[in-house]
């Protein structure tokens, strides 16, 4: 069926989930996020978000009845509610994350699901949400939505299995309203071919030496690196991290005990012939991970990071360097969102038949 199913995206960020769902055949009626620059990014891309209403809003301020009325919908009529509540509070890498107020955004999102009663919903988050920090919050919220009449599907997906040139594990929870006796949704099957870093970004020309944008490719520029950081990159082959640095190039903290201090892939180069590591909100610095270019003596550019997240090459991002890196690193990879969206659309097609 070619029916366009209606969707609302909460916590839309720069629009990775939105764009993937659009590519899967959904009509995004409305999206919102608390980040001003993220909404500006969506509005700066009319090529990809036609007739798309996006607003800066806090989910706690979104009144469900008013939202549905503004979209000419009643409770129970929406096809899909999508959302990936900010996940930093569930990250196993963050000290003090147990107390992060954002942990409770999952509960608020589920309360919106129960009030809106979409036919289906998506909840995407980091695997840590199923661990010590998130398990109680998540299971309590899912129990409520299950009691309200939903089948719950829960699985950890790796983006590299769905056309994303990146190793990125995420919990993808899909809810399916119990309008029929048995659940219909099935997760997408992993693809055999994994897209490598070489396949994804090797075609890009080298950015200008002076740190300016490439004249034909926005956000494709190099950071200035210290002489020592350049020497570190020169000492590494593609796919190597700080474990391969000679002692004189190790950071002082790593000299104390390289085996127990810090992450082992910092100060590293990406591999050419494998998928990239997870693109984080700080991917613009190779001191934060294996984010050095495979062969050029620089960190990967913002544009390269966006491509590794499967955003189109001409996708516009609004904000300064830090803001754009955060938007890219926090996004749901477009190709993975599309793969899940296609399966949800198949489920809705079966529903209508």
Residue ranges and their predicted role:
Residues 220-353:
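C-terminal target-recognition/interaction regions appended to catalytic cores
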